[in-house]
From Swiss-Prot:
Residues 593-671 form the BRCT domain. InterPro entries: BRCT_dom (IPR001357), BRCT_dom_sf (IPR036420), DisA/LigA_HHH (IPR041663), DNA_ligase (IPR001679), DNA_ligase_AS (IPR018239), DNA_ligase_CS (IPR033136), DNAligase_adenylation (IPR013839), DNAligase_N (IPR013840). The keyword ATP-binding does not apply. Disulfide bonds: none annotated. Zn(2+) binds at residues 408, 411, 426, 432. HAMAP family: DNA_ligase_A (MF_01588). This is DNA ligase.
Length: 671
């Protein structure tokens, strides 16, 4: 018996630990499925040994004690939880138990709803006015969150309509839609705030702020699903009727509610909701199935912690626990280096998961993750599996630190992480196999070297057949080799070779743009070319030198400096020059000798032009001594606004910068 008592004590201690983390700290350490498994184990053991059941066992109550920082509210009608079923067989057994208890073979009518994944709350209305709101807490005592609930726009402060009871306590779920969850985390990443693991944690954390002004900024919403206190009024005698009455009084109710007259209809509803789950826009973890008749509900009654007339039919768990066996680093097509956790394979939501993205170094630090850790994995819908949190209380002794590579795992080039960015990137854009296709497609594009006839599909084949590894290899292609590609005849192949030969004559600005240096667009490339004049001068430039170019700040300057510091990039540039790529020598423009109102001014073009292309306008402006920048700043002298000018025009007006339209530009050109 001692061993049974020890098992019970251990299970209760473990469950209380997880209840505290879930209900009080809003930081669950294990997925719901693991908590449910432990609870089932405890309930089964207590059923076998009823003499060992204690009043404070987790099976005898709901949740954990409230935080001391909120005033406490005693629920006049306890807020109970629901028992769970996890498969069709268990639901059918529940259905039979209900019919047996009712001593009836008549078909039951079930009311089926979504099981929302948020925070259960009680809201008390007196004479139609919201007077108090509370969390479930331990089911008997909750926390007073009235001030915070009043900030949720979905919850009416005053009920509308007729026949409103003198005292009405509605119960429901406060939750956070997925778009709101993403918005909160995006803002937290930007400001260095707390990143939430999932919408449920974000909703709980938002609702239990001591400062209601913080809660008011969070896009929380609410669905009503039940009633507690009812005094001085009458409600319909069915569950669905009550939901419809709540809706008439202005309380939000889910539109996914359905009456089912058979167990088969309930199962069909369950599977349809499971299918629609990814497109709902908010998290659910199952469906709730209730006897629709209030009279039958009263006849069925309650057990210690749950009603006999309702059950939660939960979906396969979207979270599971496993171990991180290793971390590998993948390089994306833009050079982003992403850490990927190699996991002990585990079934999550019906899929065997063996890998999970770790996003970046900041995410690893936030998680406090080490190789060998026990972790919670989440897979929702089609989302790539990710690590939600580390189970630090079960950390093995032999875990290892995760070290980000100093060199690209594909090509060996240096990696960079610019201040203010979360992504670590490979700097070997011209040689890295992982970036090869995108780098080549950019190199031959119309605004770069403009190789006519060299489309994306040709580049794909050239890379896949390993005919081309760097941009310099393009200029060694023969018509004979190109003829071996799909849909490439001798004439088309020769045309591509001719186009490559023609592309060797370019401009310094186009060449710089074609190199694909991160953050260097056409305008920045033109500015760099105009400022430094020669490739030799640009390659020698320091980060401080680079920031003297209009529209080049510390981030762009760092990217440019790191690009030319990488030896492999300089090697490819050397080979391109050996293949005959060239451009005219720089023309030194003496601004003082140019008779133009644009000479010496930093100009920004925005909007669309009708009389000439943006490229032609830029070329004209540079030729008459202007510096053309890509964004508006205090250094900008003039903005030329075409049709549908947007944020750049607004910023110019805000900074008091002179603005002219296309017609005035042409007049100043002398046209």
């Amino acid at each position: 018996m001692d061993s049974i008592e020890q098992q019970l004590t251990q299970l209760r201690t473990t469950l209380r630990h997880h209840e505290y983390l879930y209900h009080v700290m809003d930081a669950p350490e294990v997925p719901d499925a693991e908590y449910d498994r432990l609870m089932r184990e405890l309930r089964e053991l207590e059923a076998q040994h009823p003499e060992l059941v204690t009043p404070d066992s987790p099976t005898q109550r709901v949740g954990a004690a409230p935080l001391a920082s909120f005033s406490q509210v005693r629920h006049e009608v306890p807020m109970l939880s629901l028992d769970n079923v996890f498969d069709e067989e268990s639901f059918l057994a529940f259905n039979k138990r209900v019919q047996d208890r009712l001593k009836s073979a008549d078909t039951l009518t079930w009311c089926c709803e979504l099981k929302l994944d948020g925070l259960a709350v009680s809201i008390l209305y007196e004479n139609g006015l919201l007077v108090r709101a509370a969390t479930r807490g331990d089911g008997t005592t909750g926390e007073d969150i009235t001030a915070n609930v009043r900030t949720i726009r979905a919850i009416p402060l005053t009920l509308r309509g007729d026949n409103i009871p003198a005292r009405l306590e509605v119960r429901g779920e406060v939750f956070l839609p997925q778009k709101g969850f993403e918005k909160i985390n995006d803002e937290a990443r930007r400001t260095g705030g707390k990143i939430f693991a999932n919408p449920r944690n974000a909703a709980a954390g938002s609702l239990r702020q001591l400062d209601p002004r913080i809660t008011a900024k969070r896009p929380l919403t609410f669905f009503c699903y039940g009633v507690g206190i009812l005094e001085g009024g009458v409600l319909p005698d069915t569950h669905l009727g009550r939901l419809l009455q709540f809706k008439e009084w202005g309380l939000p109710v889910s539109n996914r509610v359905q009456l089912c007259d058979s167990p088969e209809a309930v199962l069909a509803f369950y599977h349809k909701v499971e299918e629609d789950r990814p497109s709902l826009g908010f998290d659910i973890d199952g469906v709730v199935i209730k006897v629709n008749s209030l009279a039958l509900q009263e006849q069925l009654g309650f057990v210690a912690r749950a009603p006999r007339w309702a059950v939660a039919f939960k979906f396969p768990a979207q979270e599971q626990m496993t171990f991180v066996r290793d971390v590998e680093f993948q390089v994306g097509r833009t050079g982003a280096i992403t850490p990927v956790a190699r996991l002990e394979p585990v079934q999550v939501a019906g899929v065997l998961v063996s890998n999970a993205t770790l996003h970046n170094a900041d995410e690893i630090a936030r998680l406090g993750l080490r190789i060998g850790d026990k972790v919670v994995i989440r897979r929702a819908g089609d989302v790539i599996p990710q690590v939600v949190n580390v189970v630090e209380s079960e950390r093995p002794d032999d875990t290892r630190e995760i070290v980000f590579p100093a060199h690209c795992p594909v090509c060996g080039s240096d990696v960079e992480r610019v201040e203010g960015e979360v992504v670590t990137r490979c700097t070997g854009g011209l040689i890295c196999g992982a970036q090869r296709k995108e780098a080549l497609k950019h190199f031959v594009s119309r605004r770069a070297l403009d190789v006519d006839g060299m489309g994306d599909k040709i580049i794909d084949q050239l890379v896949e057949k390993e005919y081309v590894h760097t941009p310099a290899d393009l200029f060694r292609l023969s018509a004979g080799k190109l003829t071996g590609l799909d849909r490439m005849g001798p004439k088309s192949a020769q045309n591509v070779v001719n186009a490559l030969e023609k592309a060797k004559e370019t401009t310094f600005a186009r060449f710089l743009y074609a190199l694909g240096i991160r953050e260097v667009g056409e305008a920045t490339a033109a500015g760099l070319a105009a400022h430094f004049g020669t490739l030799e001068q640009l390659e020698k430039a320091t980060i401080d030198d680079l920031q003297k170019v209009p529209d080049v700040g510390i981030v762009v300057a760092t990217h440019v400096f790191n690009f030319f510091a990488e030896e492999s990039n300089r090697d490819v540039i050397g080979k391109l020059l050996e293949e005959g790529i060239h451009w005219p020598a720089p023309v030194v423009i003496n601004v003082e000798e140019i008779d133009s109102p644009f000479a010496g001014k930093t100009v920004v073009l925005t909007g669309s032009l009708s009389q000439m292309s943006r490229d032609d306008a830029k070329a004209r402006l540079v030729a008459i001594g202007a510096k053309v920048a890509g964004s508006v700043s205090k250094k900008t002298d003039l903005v030329i606004a075409g049709e549908a000018a947007g944020s750049k025009l607004a910023k110019a007006q805000e900074l008091g910068i002179d603005v002219i339209d296309e017609a005035e530009m042409l007049r100043l050109f002398g046209e």
